[in-house]
Amino acid sequence: MMWKLIIVTILAVGVLCDDIATAVNEQTTQQIRDTLKAQCKKNGAEDKAQDVENAAKNFVECVKGLFDFSTIKKEIEDAKPNGALDEVFGKYCAKSPQLKTCIHTLTTSATPCLEASVREQVGPINNGADQLIDFICYKDGDRIALFIAEGGPECFQEKSEGIRACAEKLKNNVGSVEAAQSLTLVEQCGKYDELTACIIKSLEECSTPTPGNMAESLFRFVRKGSPCNKAAPLKN
């Protein structure tokens, strides 16, 4: 399944990222850890669960080493009045090669806990992540600079409840991580389309169309680089 690698890596990061761990209760954290261990055991790699968790911790530290989000936020606010957002994002987009390495290391570390058929997706997943970063950092971050300048973050904050409702609807429809893993590729693509359409519809209610349009472009870009592009091509 195309999303199993993503699921395993998210579980691993969710277990060990301090910021996430403080946002959920201890029982939920343990459930995530147990699910990760079960996934590893299922594929004869129970002894690798701790390695995956350690890799996730290293990933979090890797990202923190590249980006101080408090500093970035201040730099963005300082740059807005001067129209210098492109300079801020150009500086951080220059770190994209290191970020790609962080991601590749994490996904590679997760492979022992995956079925053999899914391990074949590690390359495409890494390529997809690279393309996503390149999309965001197009022309040294022009896209994200425009997104910020056009009130993108404010739009997302304003519509956070609607976006959360979209995610909750998907969660209720799927049921569980195990149920998500059992979906066929076409079904997974359908769920992705439902979720992204719901999010776009919510963002389109903002005062400016830019955030919704950019989100739609991003979602389509991600989809085009995934197996969904061939398995369940869009009609338009």
Curated annotation (Swiss-Prot):
Assigned keywords, A-Z: Secreted, Signal
One GO term describing the cellular component: extracellular region
Location, primary (coarse class): secreted
Subcellular locations according to the entry: Secreted
Top-rank taxon, per record: Eukaryota
InterPro entries attached to this UniProt entry: DUF1397 (IPR009832)
Signal peptide residues on this chain, from the entry's feature table: 1-17
Pfam families: DUF1397 (PF07165)
The keyword Secreted belongs to this UniProt entry's keyword annotation: yes
Reported tissue expression: Hemolymph.
Assembly: Monomer.
Entry similarity comment: Belongs to the UPF0408 family.
Entry protein name: 27 kDa hemolymph protein
Source organism (scientific name): Galleria mellonella
